[in-house]
Amino acid sequence: MLSTRIQCALALLSLALAVCSVSAAPTDAKLRQLLQRSLLNPAGKQELARYTLADLLSELVQAENEALEPEDLSRAVEKDEVRLELERAAGPMLAPRERKAGCKNFFWKTFTSC
């Protein structure tokens, strides 16, 4: 029983490593290409620096977004709850808006009747 669990865990681990290595492959090829260009051309060093900076910034933004997701979800839930409470508090006591005869409003480049 224990050996089958270990085998399953190892199989899942190897599968996860294989997926991670495959997903990282294109960036390695791009980096290798930029390194070859930088050796041949001095302007390639600047391109390499831009690429590494962009890669670093994208990783930081992704980590920040992952860290903020739970907080944003809780804030959104709180806002929805407040909105629902306000709607319930207003209830049927609010009378529908009465429109005057011949009244027109200017909305988005056209006149609409009130």
From Swiss-Prot:
Stored InterPro entries: Somatostatin, Somatostatin/Cortistatin_C
**Keywords of the record:** Cleavage on pair of basic residues, Disulfide bond, Hormone, Secreted, Signal
Query: Matching Pfam families, A to Z?
Result: Somatostatin
| Gene Ontology BP, a term | regulation of cell migration
Please state where this protein is localized: Secreted
Q: Per its record, what are the GO molecular function terms?
A: hormone activity
Query: What are the disulfide bonds?
Result: C103-C114
Signal peptide feature range: 1-24
Q: Which PANTHER family match?
A: SOMATOSTATIN
Q: What is this protein called?
A: Somatostatin-1A
Cite the source lineage.
Eukaryota, Metazoa, Chordata, Craniata, Vertebrata
